[in-house]
């Protein structure tokens, strides 16, 4: 799918291990799982944090992968 998308963390719950990223381009909010956070070498995400990510589709839903801090 799409690569190098810029966005901002809308919210992330480290207890539930997921959250959502708001795309700067106005697209739909994107689900982000703890596995993407871990793969980026991060412990958690903070609300309002600027990120860059790629979109991957699984089972008809878009997920943030290859997460990087902007």
Swiss-Prot record:
SMART domains named in the record: CSP (SM00357)
Top-level taxonomic group: Bacteria
Major location category of this protein: cytoplasm
Annotated localization: Cytoplasm
CSD domain segment(s): 7-67
Pfam families membership: CSD
Gene Ontology MF annotations: DNA binding
InterPro entries noted in UniProt: Cold_shock_CspA (IPR012156), Cold_shock_domain (IPR050181), CSD (IPR011129), CSD_CS (IPR019844), CSP_DNA-bd (IPR002059), NA-bd_OB-fold (IPR012340)
Gene Ontology cellular component terms for the protein in this record: cytosol
Keyword Repressor in record: no
Entry keyword annotation includes Translocase: no
Alphabetical keyword list: Activator, Cytoplasm, DNA-binding, Transcription, Transcription regulation
PANTHER family listed in its UniProt record: COLD SHOCK DOMAIN CONTAINING PROTEINS
Name of the protein in its database record: Cold shock-like protein CspA
């Amino acid at each position: 799918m799409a690569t190098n998308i810029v966005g901002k963390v809308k919210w992330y719950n480290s207890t539930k291990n997921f959250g959502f990223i708001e795309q700067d381009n106005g697209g739909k909010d994107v689900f982000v799982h703890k596995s993407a956070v871990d793969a980026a070498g991060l412990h958690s995400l903070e609300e309002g944090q600027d990120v860059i990510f790629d979109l991957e589709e699984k089972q008809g839903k878009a997920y943030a992968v290859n997460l990087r801090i902007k």
